[in-house]
């Protein structure tokens, strides 16, 4: 019988549809079940800027989750995820919460949705993050948080691609 896992999705101000992320997860569900022996449920969490402190300090620590995916929109004025400003409190709370109940630490991914900064279709198909998005976030994260050793940062235009499914399987 497959182990049941819980994956929580987070987005501020409903700037990106979490259903798109759930589509990525659902497309990998048969492989996760067959190859890794686990199934999952998904819960959506939208929050406002004014709720970030409470979310980070009270809500997230109380959640029982195995994995978290934090989703931001590429066109947000500032993609400040892990540099001490912006979404830092939320992201770090997710990293802490997903590490407390597992042997592996910090099981939180970052998705940058609506990223139309790929050079061409070939680059988009072969990369799980655009060069533009990598430049934006690379100063905020060590390489192992970008390349799958500890986490992943994905970006895509309208929806995920096969490379994202493969990367997700690698990480799980």
Regions found by a protein language model. Give the residues of each.
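Conserved GTPase G-domain substructure that encodes guanine base recognition and part of the catalytic core
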Residues: 1-172
């Amino acid at each position: 019988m497959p182990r049941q896992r819980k994956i929580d999705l987070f987005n501020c101000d409903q700037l990106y549809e979490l259903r798109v992320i759930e589509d990525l997860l659902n497309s990998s569900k048969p492989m996760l079940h067959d190859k890794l022996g686990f199934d999952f449920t998904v819960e959506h969490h939208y929050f406002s800027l004014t709720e970030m402190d409470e979310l980070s300090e009270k809500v997230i620590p109380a959640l029982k989750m195995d994995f978290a995916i934090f989703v931001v929109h590429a066109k947000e004025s500032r993609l400040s995820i892990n540099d001490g400003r912006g979404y830092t409190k939320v992201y770090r709370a997710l990293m802490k919460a997903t590490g407390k109940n597992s042997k592996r630490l910090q099981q939180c991914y970052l998705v940058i949705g609506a990223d139309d900064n790929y050079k061409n279709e070939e680059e988009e198909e072969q990369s799980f993050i655009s060069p533009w998005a990598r430049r934006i976030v690379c100063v905020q994260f060590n390489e192992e948080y970008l390349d799958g050793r500890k986490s992943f940062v994905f970006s895509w235009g309208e929806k995920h691609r096969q490379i994202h499914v493969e990367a997700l399987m690698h990480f799980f």
